[in-house]
Swiss-Prot record:
Pfam families: UPF0175. Belongs to the UPF0175 family. This is UPF0175 protein AF_0100.
Amino acid sequence: MNAIWIVKGIENVVKSNPKRLEELLANLRRDKELFEEIVISAYVEGLISLSKASELLEITRDEMAEILRKRGVPLRNLNKDDLVAEVEAIKWF
């Protein structure tokens, strides 16, 4: 089933009423498996960093890296967000 129209429809609704995005995200987060798939897909496409993916799933970066490894998803080189997160984690200790 080609459901590109759904994605376009969501995009249009969010453009006209940005507050609906939070509602949509809240609904997506209720289905943890689906939301995890979306986050992993965004990571694979390079749309978000490892740090952002772990933040969205409310897990540690190490847990996120393990999920990716189990799925056979290669880890990308650290970007600026990941490096900042690493420095902050080190400072915490």
